[in-house]
Amino acid sequence: NVEIHSSIPVAAGLGSSAAVVAAVAKAVSHLLDVELSKEDILSITLESERLVHGTPSGIDPTITTYGGVLLFRKGRGSTRIDVKEDIPLIIGDTGIKHSTGELVSMVRQRRENYSSLINPIIKAGGKTALNAVNALKNHDFTVLGELMNINHALLCAIGVSNVPLDKLVNASRAAGAYGAK
């Protein structure tokens, strides 16, 4: 039996399920005196996420396994981004639980129904991420914040937000945050 104690909210979009699976895989490997590579842990975590969420992107297992700041591209793996200074982040929790599997399914359905509208939004999200990498490399947190704001608007456009989250994002911006999503 495994008992988990965590201050990370469950079903809040913070990748806690991937983190738990990776941690348990590592712990069990130590108990059994079996060496697991990071690739092994990633594979186990990805399979677990597939069982629970259907067809997730793989970003949570990848970041959980390798840590740090990564540029993730589904099907192309990840690239480590060397960030020299700490980035001040605040995580707000609306208390609303959601299912990653249901969100993935909803976005997939919207892509099928409205591909000419949704696909460019998703492509813009990818371009936003690439611009964010440049902002991180240049230590330009103002631009990074603007890109977070753009990304949140894109997520809203495909239906991956809710009123309480939008209120939290707006309150963060009003309080002086460079960006929020």
Identify the meaning behind each predicted range.
Residues V34, S43-H53, P61-K181:
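C-terminal nucleotide
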Residues N1-I44, L165-A174:
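Anion-binding (especially nucleotide phosphate/pyrophosphate-binding) glycine-rich loop
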